UniProtKB/Swiss-Prot annotation:
Keywords: Copper, Disulfide bond, Glycoprotein, Metal-binding, Oxygen transport, Repeat, Thioether bond, Transport. Cu cation A binds at residues 50, 61, 77. The keyword ATP-binding does not apply. It comes from the Eukaryota. Decamers of large identical subunits (450 kDa), each containing 8 globular oxygen-binding functional units. This is Hemocyanin, beta-C chain unit G. Its cofactor is Cu(2+).
Amino acid sequence: DIHTTAVAGVGVRKDVTRLTVSETENLREALRRIKADNGSDGFQSIASFHGSPPGCEHENHSVACCIHGMANFPQWHRLYVKQWEDALTAQGAKIGIPYWDWTTAFTELPALVTEEVDNPFHHGTIYNGEITTRAPRDKLFNDPEFGKESFFYRQVLLALEQTDYCDFEVQYEISHNAIHSWTGGQSPYGMSTLEYTAYDPLFLLHHSNVDRQFAIWQALQKFRGLPYNSANCAIQLLHQPMRPFSDADNVNPVTRTNSRARDVFNYDRLNYQYDDLNFHGLSISELNDVLERRKEKARIFAEFLLHGIGASADVTFDLCDSHDHCEFAGTFAILGGPLEHPWAFDRLFKYDVTDVFSKLHLRPDSEYHFNIHIVSVNGTELDSHLIRSPTVQFVPGVKDYYEK
């Protein structure tokens, strides 16, 4: 069942901006208790699921267990938020993990994580004694494309537009990366690092929202009459147990017995729900209309075949005409690091470059090239050849959606 009605209570995830004072204090007290718990359901143990210290292996090398760049990314993180949520509930939390809807334009991070006095959500302590910090980048608060809607809103709309699960997954995951990169910035112990991101409690709000976007896409798929609790791609991968949830020493029986990605498309099995599945005030049917209207206009996409580069990095790219007159074309982020599990997408990440083609008076069959700039989160410029130059696809507009 896809939930659309407003609800509240244990296992219900609310918009972080709608939390009551008592709900806020209840969550903070539960997190305080988790931080004081040195056992298998405590802060250090669950935070380590994602990154460092590495708990998984690949070709005889220790790697982080978190899954990125693969079709089971949504489900691994769906289970991970559930792991945190059940630990909070066991420590007295009366609601689920709230979500931070970063697709709505914002000028500051949620108060739940920024208030400094007696606030366990402000930062986390890492096993090595370091404290998580945040160094937000300017483009987190100011649209780098200067668009009519927020940068993140446009990126997620393109993800929600996809009707194939694996196409959706690529757009969805890369959109989520930018929040990691742009909230953590150059902090060596924070959201922009694969190894330490889960030690920052902001991670919980971010990934509650990321999972909600997955739930909204599933509701859209159901409305479209398309598969929403299964996929017709990456079949073998979606049948594989995901560690560390499948490990015998996982103390959470729900995540342990539902450790395959195919098991948790249907999140009713995990006993949580969202207060609603509206997107910017739109019902699922209204959202579908918005997505269909976007298809009426012809569009041009730069399409990247992405893979791991062993680092977290910001990517910007320019479009240049035959006279080397260049204009900023777009930006996205990669989440990775020395402990990453090797990954490579087999689907293209699409980026709408219609406006910049128009600005340079170019057509898809004109003479042009792209310049790619890759900067790691520590500020080091990386070799631009780490990412292959994108191909370009012209998608004709569909004019007859509303014609009777």
